[in-house]
A protein has these predicted regions:
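Membrane-embedded alpha-helical bundles that constitute the cytochrome b-like, heme-associated redox core
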Residues: 1-198
Length: 198
């Protein structure tokens, strides 16, 4: 993956899945809007997973060219994850079309985890700009660690839908991230380090 790839081309690639998600918001095709709900949620999870894989990939591949490219561009994937999560949320709100029903369902486990994940997405996206990074200093890194919390909540939200009957798809999606995260923890805390020589 070329390190010089323009961010504008990357943004275009990240936006491509959204092209077919626009028209259902302007017609009364409930089935199409339901498709947007599912598709946007899945792409949000995928882009978040990709952004979180950057650091463990750097370790496991000893800083391969692709891993370095992903690390340098992971913020774009994170912002794209938020954007698709926003589309996902909008599709849900419009599809329900009832504030009373939305509030009644908000405390159910599958939806509560989704709302909490989206709240974290908002705070992470709001502080993703260079100005926020400079202003927050070390606090920015602390806040970014909550991305892992958003990932866990997203996994629980997706897996618990329909009474946990659809847990296989989220498990498959998150398995590579889980494996790489375990490797990262092993590398940081459990690996045998060479003894220092006097």
């Amino acid at each position: 993956m070329p390190a010089r790839l323009s961010p504008y081309w990357l943004w275009l690639l990240l936006a491509l899945p959204a092209m077919g998600m626009i028209s259902p918001f302007f017609d009364e095709n409930t089935r199409a809007l339901r498709g947007v709900l599912h598709g946007s949620g899945e792409f949000s999870a995928r882009f978040m997973i990709i952004s979180l894989m950057a650091t463990p990939l750097m370790l496991s591949t000893k800083g391969s060219r692709f891993a370095r490219w992903l690390r340098n561009n992971r913020r774009y994937f994170g912002v794209a994850a938020f954007a698709y999560a926003a589309v996902h949320t909008a599709a849900y709100l419009i599809g329900e079309a009832s504030l009373a029903r939305i509030l009644a369902e908000a405390t159910e486990f599958d939806l509560l985890t989704g709302w909490l994940a989206f709240a974290l997405f908002i705070s992470l996206a709001a502080t993703s700009m260079d100005f926020a990074v400079r202003k927050m200093g070390l606090w920015w890194k602390w806040l970014q660690r909550w991305t892992y919390g958003a990932a866990v909540l997203t996994l629980l939200h997706w897996a618990s839908l329909h009474n946990w009957n659809g847990w296989v798809a989220p498990a498959v999606h998150f398995a590579p991230l889980a494996a790489l995260t375990l490797y990262r923890l092993w590398w940081m805390h459990l690996r045998v380090r060479p003894q220092a020589t006097a």
